[in-house]
Structure formats: C-alpha cells, structure tokens
C-alpha cells in the first residue's frame, strides 16, 4: 500500500471534496453536530474542562506537552497555571489527583504532569505526536486526543449537576461523578496500551476482504473492502479514537437519569477495571476460537482487527444490553442442578448456550453501538484540522461494512454453539439408548413426585383406599422445547409424557406396581393388584391417545417449522380389575378441537371415547366430557355424572333386556370444557427462527355437542346438576337425580329413586319401591305395590300419591310425636317443626265419597299404611283415620303421644323397631347430590343394604 505525505493528503482531500462535495458536507455536518452536542453535554455536566499545569512545572521536559497546550487553546479548553493547593477539593472528595482527570470547584481538570507521564511511558503516543518542527500536524493530533476526552466527559457527566454536587456534596451525585472520572481515567490508560495506526487498520480491513471473497453471498462486500481509499499514515489512527469510545457505551448508562443505581454502579465502577485487562483478551480469544470452529478466517490481520475492535466493545453496556440473557442463564443453571441429580443435564446445556451466545451478542452489539458513535470521538479533529476529514471518510465508508461482517460472524458463532449442544445430545442418546428429551420429561416427573410426596401419601387416608393410583401427564416443557429448537432436533421431541404411580399409606415413596399406560395404543391397565380398595386419580389432564410424528420444514431463508402429525386412536381402554375402585375420568381430555371461530371459540370438535372395564369390585366411576362405555362387571357399581358441566341426561332403559344396562344421552351445551388443541412454540437462535407444533389441553369455550354413553352391569346412576330424565328398566333400578329439576320414572322392578336437590317428579312405577324426594318441593308417586317413602327436615314440601300395597312413610330425623297431622280437603298433611309439609293426596277421598254417595264401594287404596318416626315408632293408617275424626280433622298432641308411648311399650316389637331405626338412620345420612371429589371412598348405601332393612320394615 502506498504512503501518503501531508501534501499528497491535501491534494487527495481537495480532489475528494471536488468529486464528492455533498458526501463530505454531509459527513462534516454530522461530525460538527456531534462536537456541538458534546460541548452542550459537557456544559450541562460541569463548568468547564481545564488543562492544569502546576506553577513551576517545566512543560518543555514533556514529550509533546506543548502540542496539548496549543490544542487546548484551539479547542477552547482553559489552561491553568496555579498552585496545587487550589485542588484540595479534588483530592479530598475523589482522591483522583494521581490520575489524569479530577474535580475542582471550578470544573474538571486534566492534569498535565500525569498526562505527560503517560506520554513518556507510551512511546507510541509520544513518537506519533512528534516535535515542534511539525507543530501544525501535531496540533491536529492533539486535538484528536483532547477532543476524544472531551467527548467522553460530555457523555459520562451529562447526567450530573456539577454545581449542585460541589455545593451540596450530595452522596449519590458524588458517587456517580466519581464513577465517571474513574472510568474515563481507565479509558485514557487503555488508549496508551492499544494505539494503532490508520494504515495498519486499513491493511487489516483490506486483507479481511480478501479472506471473505469466496464466502457465499459476500463477494460484493469483499470487493468493497479491498477498494477502500488508500488512507496511509494520516493521523494517530482510528484505534486511538476507538479506545476513547470504549467509554461511550458506559456513558449512555451514566448519562441516563432514569437508570437504576445498580446499572450506574455497574457501568461506572464494577466493570471499569475489567474491561482494560483480562476480559478483552478472553472475549477476543473466544470469538477467534468460535470463528475457527465455524470455518471462518482467523489470520493475523483478522485477529488483530478483532482484538482491537473488542477492546472498545467489551464495555459495561455490552453486559447490560444482554443482562437478561445472562440472568436467564444463571437462573437456568441454578434450576438445572436439581435435574442433573435426576439424570438430565439439558437445562445446564441450555444455560451454557445462553451464556456463550450472550458473550457473543454482548460483544457484537456493543461494537456496533460504538462504531455508530465514532463521530463524537473525531468531532474536534474534523472541526479544527485536516486530520479529521480522512477519519470521517473512514467512519462513513467502513462502519456499515464492519457491522455486516460482525453480524454474519455472529450467526455463524451462534450456530457453532448450537452444534455443540446438538453433539452433546446425540452423544448421550448413543450412550444411553434413549430419547434425550424423554429423559427430560422423566426428570421433571421425578421432581414433581418429590415435591408432592407428602400430599400423595396422605391421599390414601383422604380417599379411604389402600392404594392410590396417580396418573400424571407431564405437559409440554418450554425449556425442553428451546433445547430441541437450538439443537435442530425438533423432530425428536414429544408434547409430553404420561406416568402411572402407586402410593400406599405408610410408604414414603411410590410403590412398585405392575400398572401401565400405553399412549400410542390408548391402553391403561391397572388391573393387577392384590389390594381390596384403590382410587385412580388423574392428577393432570391426560391428552388423547395416539402416536406423534414430526417433520421439520424450511419456511423461509432462516425460518423453520416442525409440523405435528398424529396417528390418532379414537378411544382409551381402561381395565380396572377386581379391587373396589374409584375412578375419576373428568380430568381426561376427550374432545379434540377441529375448527375455531374468529374469537378463538371451538365450533367443531372430535370425540375420544373411554371404554372402562371395572371388574368384580364395588366401583365408583365419575364420567367426563364425552362418550363413555362402562362394563361394571360383578359387584355393586355406581356411575356418577355429578362433576363438570357435561350436559343434562336422558337415561332410557325401557327397552333393555339385561339388568344394569342403560343408554345415556347427553347434550353438552355451550360452555367451557377441556379440549386438545395444537399450539406453537417459538425459539430464536440469532437470525434462525424455529417453530414447533405441540399438543396441549385447553379449557376453551365451545358450541354444544351430543354424546351417548353405554352402561352395562351398573347398579346405580347419579345424575348431573342439570334437569335429567330417568326412564327405568323392567329390572331393579337405583337412580339419583342430583341437582336440577329431574324426572325419574322407575318403570318396573323394585327401584330405589332419589330426587336429590330441585323440584323433582318421581314415579316408582310397578314394584316395591324406595322413594326419597330430597331437597325441593317434590311430586312423588308410589304405584300399586309396597312402597317406602322417606322425608327429612330440609327436604321441603312433598306431595305423595299412592295407590295400593302396604306402604310406609318414614321421617328420618323427626320423632313422630313432634309432627302435626291434619286433614285438608281430601288429603292428609303432615307438618314438621320447621313447617315443611308432606301432603298425601286423596287420603280421605274414598271415605268422603262413601259418606256422601249412597251405596258407594271403595275401589282404590290411596293411604299409606304406616307412618314412622326416627326412633322406629309408628302410627297406622287406621289410627290416623280414627284420631283425625276424633280431633275434628287434626290429631291432638296428646293423642299422638299416647300412640307413640303405646308402641314403645310393646316388647314384641322392639327388635323390629331397632331395625327400622337403622333403616331411617341410613337413609338420613345419605345425600345423593354429594360431590365425592375429595373423598372418593365415601360410603353410599347400596340397594342391597337398604333392601335388607326394607324387608324388616315390611315384616313389621
């Protein structure tokens, strides 16, 4: 490269001005504006910048100090020649008098002796400044030095009110100002240790271009780099300015009045010493190593360029710009320690990735920031001499090119770090013969068990089961997803994993068990147990069965999406076994979203069936949101529809030919229910964007849908919170209306019908029926056979119609003598102490007709033959008729008490009385609408229990 003399430089500059006047004017305007802004910033922060020369100090002994004096005059920097005693405030307040910069009560002082010593210690600067024989050129070079210092101070101290600081000694302002001066002093020291010449920099740029000429997509860039103007030895060089600019990024923080104290301290003090020494070397070496690994050039000139550029880049701002990334890495690393102990180090890999890429990102980001701010460092030179013009051209022509190169290098370095993550995962999988991300889910599940062990162990007592079987769906994990995206192994990850664990009271860890769950084929087997009772609990929503496959597709230049394909299975088959089990399916996802409206509501969905084989035990099954097929097997089995808003029931067994078989239709109206949806996880690796589709449960609002359940070998059905319709079979049925206004028809058979809450209509039909209205004002019909009616306090006002048979009405929690019996029209009203009435319609109709119609012959028996109190005491229909007649349409309290006393003294009836007491107590303790969510083992009286007592009652 040819050398440039001062005269040739002037000639070249004149030609450049002639050929590119507009461009140079634009550059000059930018730089002058930068200088003006710098001056304003400095004036806002301090009274003035002063070059201090102690009285008696021989400036001639310095190497180039006279040039600095002339430059100070040229730049409007005041020169002091005073006694050192006037600087006491600087020494006492900041202890900076042994450094280049300090404070006085009149402004910021640049100490000439310290600067002179710096020039002596660093011959590069001294030799470059030269002697008095080339004073015109040296003034320009000195302008560059002082102009850079002036620029830094303008940024560093623009957030400080110096007048207030000096007058009030505000401690916060003092610390901030001290931090700024400490930083600037370190930066000037950095200049002395890293000065380079412009021609060396230009040579590095040119050679870098030659190394990049064969890189795909960068051919044009390499030509531009090699065709830069011949800059020669025009000045001290860009790297003096670059060294000064290492303070620019920190200045941005220090000058920001809104910045936190923590950030200002970090920018001004904590990192100031680090950026001068080992950090610069470490980051430079790291970036070079990454370039080698990425197949990029690392020759001497390129290494020198990187080292000199990183010297200005590794500033506090470079850390603060990516503080979140480093904090994230620290959090993930701390998080990873637990899972490493559980056999998964993916979180540590993720933390290392964020830390390494954070270092790269910090360096490159700050380099770009510093390059964009170079005009502040050369402002003085461009305004006062010819030296600034070629530097300005260099800034305008090269900054954008360097930025492009660095961005290209950054992505390559990111991908190299990602490749290391990829290789570690592949190496682990080869060694352990297992999917790495599945291991991640396994570790998450083990940690979950550890966190919830006390709760899970106590479930045995809460659910009254010898063994609790917990089925847990580990959901999509964002950190595992990030790792798959970074390593480009997105086709190997799954949406989660399901686990089966067993817990027994007294054990402090999950029990060894033979249970299994097969997601691909939709099989859950919990049948092999030697326990008498067990409770099956789906702890988290279980996704639908099927096998996932993924395909990674490139969407754009740097964007990829991994599409999810599912080979679905349309049902879960659950085998429970012979233990008496409680199984709750309400937390199983049975609906798959297919279509959405503009608001994101589900307007079309697909059904996933549950097929439950219960075995020989006495089982309780809670039905979920969609089609359920249940085979109860042997034992007394109950099916509950009492949880969730899963629609009103229409149960029809009128055509069934097998006992315990029912068809249950449900319309699940517009509401929220668990649906399986497809979501997208996004991760960015530099410029590379990765999207991964995965499944998740979503409690979405949906339009209505209809399902039909099929029940076999089921002894009891508990209804929903809606208005249900029950149509019984020709066999014995047990129905519980639950909440809502229910219509219950027992049809044939000896039925047990419970209305539950709400104003229900209950018809026992043919057979010997057991009828309980429950809360609400119910209408109850018993039919022609031997029926038992039950009422307790709080059940409301019930109307009973009976016709024939030997019937009984039991008040389960009221003594007979505390009731009031009245004739109202042709009906009998029985009133408890709360004022609730049980009205037996047409009780006296036949008698009234016989007394008013000649030769009338009774055709129907509309009376209930026995009315029973909570202690088993009773009154017969004949006694009621007699006492009502004697008491003028009401039984007196004395007459009723006598009936009770006479009954209690009858020894031959005592055993029967005890049996009836058990019957009434049993019925009184039962609430058909109870939600057994917290106690799946709660005792519910079965038809077998009740019928035994009914037979005793009838025998009486």
From Swiss-Prot:
GO terms for molecular function: calcium ion binding; channel activity; toxin activity. It comes from the Bacteria. Pfam families: HemolysinCabind (PF00353), RTX (PF02382), RTX_C (PF08339). Keywords: Calcium, Cytolysis, Hemolysis, Host cell membrane, Host membrane, Lipoprotein, Membrane, Myristate, Repeat, Secreted, Toxin, Transmembrane, Transmembrane helix, Virulence. InterPro entries: Hemolysn_Ca-bd, RTX_C, RTX_pore_form, RTX_toxin/Mannuronan_C5-epim, RTX_toxin_determinant-A, Serralysin-like_metalloprot_C. One of its GO terms (biological process) is killing of cells of another organism. It is found in: Secreted; Host cell membrane. Fatty acylated by LktC; the toxin only becomes active when modified. Hemolysin-type calcium-binding repeats lie at residues 718-735, 736-753, 754-771, 772-789, 792-809. One of its GO terms (cellular component) is membrane. Its main location: secreted. The chain crosses the membrane at residues 238-254, 302-320, 383-406. It is a multi-pass membrane protein. The Gly-rich region is probably involved in binding calcium, which is required for target cell-binding or cytolytic activity. The three transmembrane domains are believed to be involved in pore formation by the cytotoxin. Belongs to the RTX prokaryotic toxin (TC 1.C.11) family. Bacterial hemolysins are exotoxins that attack host cell membranes and cause cell rupture by forming a pore. PANTHER family: S-LAYER PROTEIN (PTHR38340:SF1). This is Hemolysin. It comes from Actinobacillus suis.
